[in-house]
Amino acid sequence: MKNLSIIANWKLNGNKNTITNSLINLTTQLTNIPQYIKIAIAPPILYIDMVKNHLTSYNNKTIELCSQNVDIHLSGAFTGDISASMLKDLSVKYVLIGHSERRIYHKENNSLIAQKFSIIKQTELIPILCIGENKEERDSGSTQSICIQQIDSIIKLVGIKAFENTIIAYEPVWAIGSGSSASPRNVQSIHQFIRNYIAQYDKTIANQISIQYGGSITTDNVLEFITQKDIDGVLVGSASLDIRNLIKIINLSSNLIKKTYQ
């Protein structure tokens, strides 16, 4: 059975009170999570240290920290940015890059995202590379070529070996926050295509790499996705803001793993 990763992206949401309450519920209600499930939270960067301190105080060994963004520089006169080395200093393990909202609202292109990927690997953090097509690209049948372009920009800069200990998150832009998810069968076919494409460069990396799905994941559909052969976890956005939903998604995944290993 494959490992599963569940990443909760809280985006620009929450405050000290709501985040603290969410963490209390998470750390007290999540028990006996199998080692094959990896869980991470991506709070607003301002609250990363607070989240870290809470997890430490509860002697948490289950939930890791994820950053929603990173700069391409490690230090310097770059007002408002945060470096990979700073994130590492705060015990962050994962970093999201290439998310469609960063591509759309902050005009981040493949070249910049590749530079972020490079600096994350240099700092020995784990990149979560988000790739996927928008509605127009989907309607024109360009899904595969768009995914190839986004992956190739990384390979061109740092080589295929940099995909070791990396997560790819396929997130069709048209499905994010829309309440309309892609079908599990369609997502499986795209994940299989991504894995096969990477295998053209390195079969070992292709077999080992974790490929998540992100796009209107809910408690009602999560099992339909994670039971697909090439879907190795989920990147959960709006559904994770209700901590009850996030706990249920984790428990559903956990129970599936436990049944598999019984």
Swiss-Prot record:
An annotated GO cellular component: cytosol
Highest taxon of the lineage: Bacteria
GO terms for biological process, alphabetical: gluconeogenesis; glyceraldehyde-3-phosphate biosynthetic process; glycerol catabolic process; glycolytic process
Binding-site residues, substrate: 9-11, 177, 216
SUPFAM superfamilies: Triosephosphate isomerase (TIM)
Subcellular location: Cytoplasm
Pathway: Carbohydrate biosynthesis; gluconeogenesis; Carbohydrate degradation; glycolysis; D-glyceraldehyde 3-phosphate from glycerone phosphate: step 1/1
Keyword set, alphabetical order: Cytoplasm, Gluconeogenesis, Glycolysis, Isomerase
Active site, per annotation: 99, 171
Keyword Isomerase belongs to the record: yes
UniProt catalytic activity: D-glyceraldehyde 3-phosphate = dihydroxyacetone phosphate
Gene Ontology MF terms in the entry: triose-phosphate isomerase activity
EC number: 5.3.1.1
Family of this protein: Belongs to the triosephosphate isomerase family.
Subunit comment: Homodimer.
HAMAP family given in the database record: TIM_B
Record-linked PANTHER family: TRIOSEPHOSPHATE ISOMERASE (PTHR21139:SF42)
Role played: Involved in the gluconeogenesis. Catalyzes stereospecifically the conversion of dihydroxyacetone phosphate (DHAP) to D-glyceraldehyde-3-phosphate (G3P).
Name the UniProt record assigns to this protein: Triosephosphate isomerase
Source organism of the structure: Blochmanniella floridana
Organism taxonomic ancestry: Bacteria, Pseudomonadati, Pseudomonadota, Gammaproteobacteria, Enterobacterales
